[in-house]
A protein has these predicted regions:
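Conserved substrate/cofactor phosphate-moiety recognition/catalytic segment
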Residues: 14, 21-70, 74
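Phosphate-binding P-loop
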Residues: 1-3
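Hydrophobic anchor at the beta1->P-loop junction of P-loop NTPases
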Residues: 8
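Small-molecule kinase domains that catalyze NTP-dependent phosphoryl transfer to phosphate-bearing small molecules
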Residues: 110-113, 118-166, 174-189
Length: 195
């Protein structure tokens, strides 16, 4: 039983992490699959703080997150990754890494820049506009909207629960999960031969 990776992309403040955490909670209730959230900020801060925010560092960040997510999917779990993932090449790399191991779903949180700036409680956008934060996505570094997203959600007028419901429906359809599948215990792992 292969798993899935739900890979979010969108600007800072678009709602990616909020929806990702709510989706994880929803998918974990009564399910047999392990659900793991890979938050872009947390992954970067805890695992590879040496990476910068230039284009190459961003690509490396996405590749590393996707590789970890692919391992989770290969073992039948569901990884929910929520980085900004601003470049089409990085998202294509993520898809290529995941698809041999499981289902890849791209969720584009398309909340407009103006709304993201209004939500910015940390003042990151203001600092970026003042030139204090270089390579800030949407201000001094580009964001390339995807044209291949499985789900597109603008959180300007969409509640978290509605967003989660839309994504969950796609996840379940793509994994062919019925209520019976979710209630059934996970199968034993295949036997391995001694080395």
């Amino acid at each position: 039983m292969s798993g899935a990776v739900v890979f979010f992309t969108g600007l800072s403040g678009s709602g990616k992490s909020t929806i990702a955490r709510a989706l994880a909670a929803e998918l974990s209730q009564g399910g047999t699959r392990q659900v793991t959230v890979l938050d872009g900020d947390e992954m970067r801060r805890r695992l590879w703080p040496e990476l910068g925010f230039d284009a190459r560092s961003r690509e490396m960040n996405i590749e590393r997150i996707a590789w970890i997510a692919s391992l989770i999917a290969a073992h039948g779990g569901i990884a929910i990754a929520a980085p900004i993932a601003p470049f089409a090449t990085g998202r294509a790399t993520a898809r290529a890494l995941v698809e041999p191991s499981g289902t890849f779903l791209l969720v584009y949180v398309s909340t407009p820049l103006e709304v993201c700036e209004q939500r910015d409680s940390k003042g990151l956008y203001a600092r970026a506009r003042a030139g204090e934060i270089p390579d800030f996505t949407g201000i001094s570094s580009p964001y390339e909207p995807p044209d291949d997203a499985d789900v597109v959600i603008d959180t300007t007028d969409t509640e978290v629960g509605e967003a989660v419901g839309r994504i969950r429906a796609v996840v379940e359809r793509r994994l062919s999960l019925s209520a019976d599948d979710r209630a059934r215990p996970a199968s034993d792992p295949p036997a391995t031969r001694p080395a």
